[in-house]
Amino acid sequence: NTLYKEQAHIIRSIAAEGNGAVFLGRCAEIVLAGQPEVYSFFICADDAYRTRRAGTHYGGMSLKQLNEIEEKRSNYYAFYTGKKWGDPQNFDLVINTSRIQLEQAADLIIDYVNRVQGE
């Protein structure tokens, strides 16, 4: 619980600086809920894509290992937020990267933020 509180404090402090930041995980969309100009995205992929990517980016982890990590993330998220990890209602946009390239996903995120900001 102390670690979560410290992480939340750091996330809020960095966000308050107003220089823009990207937070990966750590329940940041919940920690920063209600703050202006906060956008949250959930990136997912099917098992085939996750397995292929794990072979090139995560030391060749097996799907079983990836699922164990995902279960830990899910439990962490549920414990600290009371919400279901990956629930689309908790995010502005959910992107399945097994259907589009990562660069296209980044473009979608940029386009989303620009549209919300009225550009």
Where are these regions (language model features)?
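ATP-dependent small-molecule kinase phosphotransfer cores
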Residues: N1-G20
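Short, amphipathic alpha-helical "lid/cap" segments that border enzyme active or binding sites
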Residues: A8, L102-I110
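Short, well-ordered alpha-helix to beta-strand connector turns
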Residues: G18, Q35-E37, F91
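Short, well-ordered beta-strand core segments
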Residues: A21, V38-S40, V94
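Short, polar loop motifs at secondary-structure junctions
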Residues: G25-I30
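Conserved phosphate-donor/acceptor-positioning beta-strand/loop module used by diverse small-molecule
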Residues: G34-H57, L63-I69
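Small-molecule kinase domains that catalyze NTP-dependent phosphoryl transfer to phosphate-bearing small molecules
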Residues: G60-E103
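C-terminal helical "lid" subdomain and adjoining coupling/linker elements of P-loop NTPases
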Residues: V116-E119
